[in-house]
């Protein structure tokens, strides 16, 4: 069975975006994102797909959209999370990585079995996209790693991995 895995970076108030862009510069988090997703299918919304500027190489780029249109070559339109899961399953993928935005996270959260969250130690002014609140009692933290800000990483971060209770 293909697991639904949410991957996101969020601030203290769950902000994940501003003006269709990431509101921070975190080089190490981008490297971590690549390591977590390379070779796996991705599910994203249309705005997230547009913000990427291109299809991410080495990954199947699935865009959840009602219109059936995708912004860039190398991306595929899907009409539902079920369709995305079917495609991932047909490819033999163990995980379907959900990478945003806010509406897609909210849609997928009830079915997700794992989350890789980057907790960014800041509060974004003017944020307009948010990761959904979730019931901590339904999740078990299985890993946490702290990193300090430096010349390539604008803020302190914590990488936290959660597994839904009963799914580990």
List each language-model region with its residue ranges.
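Flexible, gly/pro- and Lys/Arg-enriched active-site loops
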Residues: 4-168
């Amino acid at each position: 069975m293909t697991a639904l895995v949410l991957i996101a970076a969020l601030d203290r108030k769950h902000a994940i975006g501003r003006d269709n862009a990431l509101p921070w510069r975190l080089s190490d988090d981008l490297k971590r994102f690549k390591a977590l997703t390379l070779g796996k299918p991705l599910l994203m919304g249309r705005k997230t797909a547009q913000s990427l500027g291109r299809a991410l190489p080495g990954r199947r780029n699935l865009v959840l959209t009602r219109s059936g249109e995708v912004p860039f070559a190398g991306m595929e339109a899907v009409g539902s999370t079920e369709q995305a899961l079917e495609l991932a399953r047909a490819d033999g993928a163990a995980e379907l990585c959900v990478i945003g935005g806010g509406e897609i996270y909210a849609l997928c959260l009830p079915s997700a079995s794992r989350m890789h969250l980057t907790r960014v130690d800041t509060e974004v002014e003017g944020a307009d996209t948010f990761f959904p609140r979730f019931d901590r009692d339904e999740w078990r933290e299985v890993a946490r790693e702290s990193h300090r800000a430096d010349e390539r990483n604008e803020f302190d971060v914590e990488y936290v991995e959660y597994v839904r209770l009963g799914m580990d």
